[in-house]
Amino acid sequence: MFVARSIAADHKDLIHDVSFDFHGRRMATCSSDQSVKVWDKSESGDWHCTASWKTHSGSVWRVTWAHPEFGQVLASCSFDRTAAVWEEIVGESNDKLRGQSHWVKRTTLVDSRTSVTDVKFAPKHMGLMLATCSADGIVRIYEAPDVMNLSQWSLQHEISCKLSCSCISWNPSSSRAHSPMIAVGSDDSSPNAMAKVQIFEYNENTRKYAKAETLMTVTDPVHDIAFAPNLGRSFHILAIATKDVRIFTLKPVRKELTSSGGPTKFEIHIVAHFDNHNSQVWRVSWNITGTVLASSGDDGCVRLWKANYMDNWKCTGILKGNGSPVNGSSQQGTSNPSLGSNIPSLQNSLNGSSAGRKHS
């Protein structure tokens, strides 16, 4: 059962993103009011705003947490063409702010010449790295070589996507069989911009990212994209928020069947396709086991999707904007039964979803 709690966020404008930390006890929100707020969950389950500050000189599109082994670290990105990294500092014993925490800007990443539309930390096994994407069609990957000094970030890679970028997602798999991989979505509306999802893979030989696949069937603007946690699967699952919800599987083709030294090739299948929102879908987010997908759309609802024992994806719950459940929520979309879901456990730890627009 899902319990909904309403929070008076007190942002002065549209909230574009909601992000939970690794443990689900901290939350960050960002808004067109140029601010980020941090919320902490009390023992009673209530959320309290513990920090609020102006982060950028334009709308803040996204905010995201680093893995806690790197400390309490946030990254944000904005229409002001920058991304920023923030760290929470707790006052020392000789400080008048003893025991109190505050957030300090550690760096500003200024390489983009256009709006920075998404920012994501890499999976922790890759070290402290983050990726940004921007409206100029470039994905940039940065690394902090010294995790104790978050003011120093070096630009490691620039990936040209040829299309205005709206969202990115790292493949979270830590398997040595899988090279680092990042999916990029585009909301480019120009008539010659066809396929809106590209997947890039790191090549150990060239030490560069190369395009592995393009999802040719996704031709509508993409607002969000999310790889599912892997949990030992031999294939990858990718969710896409566009005018509907789509779930794809990417199964690696055996190396001996592909050109040596080139990027991995995949068999790509769409396994679920839902237009139940009857509107633009703005966010998709997986639970920690990669078994439940949450989506939010312009219909004002969050919908939960899960593969049943027959491996058909179905809607298992609908929450309205005020948090109340919708009766008769077992709506079905178009689902392909070829997806194997052999993980029975259902975790209730869903990441935040928010319907935010990125006018630029």
Swiss-Prot record:
Region feature Disordered, mapped onto this chain: 324-360
Biased composition (Polar residues): 324-354
Cross-link for Glycyl lysine isopeptide (Lys-Gly) (interchain with G-Cter in SUMO2), residue positions: K12
Keyword Transport applies: yes
Keyword Repeat among record annotations: yes
GO BP terms: attachment of mitotic spindle microtubules to kinetochore; cell division; cellular response to amino acid starvation; cellular response to nutrient levels; mitotic metaphase chromosome alignment; mRNA transport; nuclear pore organization; positive regulation of TORC1 signaling
Pfam family, one: WD40
Alphabetically ordered keywords of this record: Cell cycle, Cell division, Centromere, Chromosome, Chromosome partition, Isopeptide bond, Kinetochore, Lysosome, Membrane, Mitosis, mRNA transport, Nuclear pore complex, Nucleus, Phosphoprotein, Protein transport, Repeat, Translocation, Transport, Ubl conjugation, WD repeat
Family listed: Belongs to the WD repeat SEC13 family.
Function: Component of the Nup107-160 subcomplex of the nuclear pore complex (NPC). The Nup107-160 subcomplex is required for the assembly of a functional NPC. The Nup107-160 subcomplex is also required for normal kinetochore microtubule attachment, mitotic progression and chromosome segregation. This subunit plays a role in recruitment of the Nup107-160 subcomplex to the kinetochore. As a component of the GATOR2 complex, functions as an activator of the amino acid-sensing branch of the mTORC1 signaling pathway. The GATOR2 complex indirectly activates mTORC1 through the inhibition of the GATOR1 subcomplex. GATOR2 probably acts as an E3 ubiquitin-protein ligase toward GATOR1. In the presence of abundant amino acids, the GATOR2 complex mediates ubiquitination of the NPRL2 core component of the GATOR1 complex, leading to GATOR1 inactivation. In the absence of amino acids, GATOR2 is inhibited, activating the GATOR1 complex.
The protein's name in its UniProt record: Nucleoporin SEH1
Organism field: Pongo abelii (Sumatran orangutan)
